[in-house]
Amino acid sequence: MKAIIIGILSALFFSVTFILNRSMELDGGSWAWSASLRFMFMLPLLLLIVGFQRNVKPVLHHIRKKPLPWFLWSTVGFGLFYAPLTFATIYGPGWLVAATFQLTILAGSFLVPLLDKEKKQKIPIQAVLISFIILSGVFLTQLEHASAVPLASVLLCVFPLILSAVAYPLGNRKMMQHVDGQLNTFQRILGMTIMSMPFWFLLSIYGFATHGLPETTQVTQTFIVAVFSGVIATVLFFYATELVRNENEKLAGVEATQSGEVVFALFGEILLLNAAFPGIVSIAGILLVILGMVLHSLATVYENRKKHPSLKKAQ
């Protein structure tokens, strides 16, 4: 249950990404700068945090031992996750982007047997079934808006988000396997940020070539995203997944808490960007998303009690 609560908190901070990225897009900012600046700001922040703990050297040592896996899965887990997600804000509001990104819930469940073939782990069916409830809510939440959007805009929003939704759990889990508990959460995020820098420098060059330098307001908002979503939310989410990394049902449950981003992003846009309040269909979708999150939490508790009957007796 602790991992689930931490996951929900991370969803709250992650929602800042969708709200402010949409805000920057509406103000005419470049999606490439919004994406690359976030990670450029994250690097010194993480160096300060990990440096204060005197844990930077183990990270660099681990990277030097096997730089290729670090570079590959950091680029996948951070670069191919966040760049497409930011690009999608051109074609849809933040809450719609957040809703579509919930495909990551199913992606995380279906990746289970592919990522650990030696242990022959099965797809957690219970988690997949509950995830379909969440996705049904996601569909209803975006239905009203999607009906008024041109097909080209829908495709340019959805396809990048499919890539993003698969890349995030894939990169995260492959790095957990590679690190194998040798580094803590902050160290792992620092290492991934360092090794994804070539990707962000290339993207910033593209941003400069197409839009010039970013405006001061975009730099400020990107810094806020870096702190709230890039550092706080990412650390909370990775910490939650680390707590349950060897238990598939619970890991799928933690990843499912990210569906809360839809709710937080929707109400954040209403309050901060004066977005229209959703209709009945969208509200029904939000309720399904919440129901799915609750069911995942209950399933996590049930699974824990089944494995440890003494916990039930103690209560």
Predicted feature locations:
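C-terminal-most transmembrane helix of multi-pass membrane proteins
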Residues: 39, 118, 251-315
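Juxtamembrane helix-entry segments on the extracytoplasmic side of multipass membrane proteins
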Residues: 1-3, 28-32, 36, 62-66, ...
